[in-house]
Curated annotation (Swiss-Prot):
Top-level class of the enzyme under EC nomenclature: hydrolase
Gene Ontology molecular function: any one: deubiquitinase activity
Keyword terms of this UniProt record: Cytoplasm, Hydrolase, Meiosis, Protease
Comp. bias (Polar residues): 191-201
Residue spans of biased composition, Acidic residues class: 152-167
Active site residues of this protein: H29, C105
Lineage: Eukaryota, Fungi, Dikarya, Ascomycota, Taphrinomycotina
Organism whose genome encodes this protein: Schizosaccharomyces pombe (strain 972 / ATCC 24843)
Stretches for region Disordered: 146-201
PROSITE patterns named in the record: PPPDE
Name of the protein described by the UniProt record: DeSI-like protein sdu1
Entry-linked SMART domains: DUF862 (SM01179)
Subcellular location: Cytoplasm
InterPro entries xref list: PPPDE_dom, PPPDE_sf
Length: 201
């Protein structure tokens, strides 16, 4: 079976974005394509439910644009084994377990790629999360600055409720850096209409 990754750019098209792409420092969403379906991972607030969903390849995604496709080695596993792997991964990657820095769509794509092809995704696709974890104080300062600028533009949001928000620097990172303030942001959403269950769509 042919396997490839669709890469989507989360940064607006600009000279800075072009430089980030050249340096491998962009912010990307990825999905793994297998047998005409694209499998990806996103966040939602349904307890015990997967965040893995399947769509047609290159679906329209709000806030990002398709950048390229990257071929992986072929998957030589029998179809029942492929289905079992995808179902198991969908149980491990729940919507509530999503973390922008420690468990994002690229982590799922990498796990699926390794299990199905024996090959990881290119490291630049998730480099920004590794940088964010290595420098959590700087990451939070930058993100809080961005959040402040966003709230200056739209002050209609109710800051007292963070039910739909998610902490960017999670507890494991905070243990090493206790002075990091909490910063919350809405995580990317899973396609709730196409979640993987005990059988593949």
């Amino acid at each position: 079976m042919k396997v490839y990754i669709n890469v989507y750019d989360l940064m607006p098209d600009s000279p800075v974005n072009k430089l980030a792409w050249t340096l491998g420092l962009g912010i990307y969403h990825t999905g793994l394509v297998l047998e005409g379906k694209e499998y990806a991972f996103g966040a939602h607030e349904i307890p015990g439910s997967t965040g893995v969903f399947a769509t047609m390849p290159r679906p329209p995604l709000e806030g990002c644009r398709w950048r390229c496709s990257i071929a992986l080695p072929n998957c030589t596993l029998p179809k029942p084994d492929v289905d079992r792997i995808l179902i198991r991964l969908s149980q491990e990657f729940t919507g509530l377990s999503y973390s922008l820095l420690e468990r994002n769509c690229n982590h799922f794509t990498n796990a699926a790629a390794i299990e199905l092809t024996g090959s990881p995704i290119p490291s630049f696709l998730n480099r920004i999360s590794r940088i964010g974890l290595a420098f959590p104080t700087i990451t939070n300062a930058l993100l809080q600055h961005g959040q402040k600028n966003t709230s200056d533009v739209d002050d209609s949001s109710d800051s007292s409720s963070d039910v739909d928000e998610e902490t960017l620097i999670v507890s494991k990172s905070k243990k090493a850096h206790k002075d990091i303030p909490k910063f919350s942001a809405p995580p990317p959403s899973a396609d709730l209409n196409n979640l993987i269950t005990d059988s593949l769509p």
